[in-house]
């Protein structure tokens, strides 16, 4: 049977959900093919969304019309702001989720969305005509023709599950791997490599002894992810903290020879920032204990996820290991930990739209691009979906810059640098992180969302008004010069604020940590009518004013630099500071400007600085 659609999405994980929903929302006739409809939106690993850097991604996805934020706000069990004591740039919202509620909400959203159809089958191969994808074939002899295809296969491409010496061809424990499609992608000439990730054991809640364990509460004023969420009053369940101990470590050390990670059984590289417990004990042998979090998987608390105990050790070793841990002495293991090895395609094979360079109309998103994490997958799925629709309409692509969004950092890192290990987002990856805070996501991306047709006009008008109020009042505060007059000193004293000794403008005064929103309203009467959302932005902009201005200067400098032309006869070879790889790529592609050079995978900002310097020296010589 032959079926037709505008856009075809392969895979119903977190990338596939966002890709299919956004494509349908933007008016494209979309079809999603997934192996199991019941596992759409399944959280295969930890039952949580958000975190450091990841919370930023989730909120950006939400503002740009994505679903992850609203699904999380409707399925969370505990909400916290991580790094709450630090500056706003590095804070991250995180939620424990009810895995069942999240999955059901996501599945129903997909099934009930207009313009979007779903079928349960396995994609086996791509149909390519004149280096352009035109559809796929499936395991039940269906043929789907489409103008654009987005592949979001997660860990299913030639997936192999490892538990001790036992191996099985699975894309997730108990589910078939996608071997035919994996072979097809290799045959098409993509640069395919292997990665590895793992998951932690789960134990029955009734078998845990919580007495003596440290209880970990949610925030009193719980944060939420979606700007559309109203009247937020979620259930807040506790997590619990326990630790490994020297006995635990010795059990694991005694079985290193049986660990697939060390025996040579696993060849793929695992996530650097989420190592297995056997890897942690091997690498940090001096540590006497490692922290573990017991996290409820659902509101029923029937199963708990042991966060921090990712492992692929044999079953008997997992049993012995878990029973050596305080609170888990009599724990009943409901699901064992395992490692999974899978194919991914080097993301340098992609453009910034996530379309492959090799095959027109083919987009890749999620773990197939070498990333790890639900949020990273969702962000890529969203961007692939948006750009597939824009290409369908012959409109300009939507590419976020590194100074606009963490999504921009994520995609730029992937397509220009590639990766040899599972890539996850951190705030430290963003050089402009003071500008890319969670709290200003709406102000950063609202205009983009509106022009893409992904934000309602009335809300955008309100947002635009808020943005204007922020800019106008910051300008007014900068122009407002205060002197240590009797009146000013008296008003400061009444607010329990330290006196000023010299002239100071309003921005510098509000940079004080002690100057609360209430004090701002009281001291500067023109701020009194402003909403809390606007006041918070003004406060943050005042506090980090010097650094924010510096980052804006750096952006302007970079934008100016990228406009610099490269002479036709410019010789790249022999320039100190350029690696052999950079020279080879520059000689091969002969970019006409530094902007074109910046688009070449493997060319770093440091390379661009060196080129800029030597172009300048040549012009002046």
Swiss-Prot record:
UniProt keyword GTP-binding, yes or no: no
NCBIfam families (alphabetical): mnmG_gidA (TIGR00136)
Any one Gene Ontology BP term: tRNA methylation
Major location category of this protein: cytoplasm
Keywords: Cytoplasm, FAD, Flavoprotein, NAD, tRNA processing
GO (cellular component) term, any one: cytosol
SMART domains per the UniProt record, alphabetical: GIDA_assoc_3
Keyword Hydrolase among record annotations: no
GO molecular function: flavin adenine dinucleotide binding
Cofactors required: FAD
Protein's name according to its UniProt entry: tRNA uridine 5-carboxymethylaminomethyl modification enzyme MnmG
Organism superkingdom: Bacteria
Function description: NAD-binding protein involved in the addition of a carboxymethylaminomethyl (cmnm) group at the wobble position (U34) of certain tRNAs, forming tRNA-cmnm(5)s(2)U34.
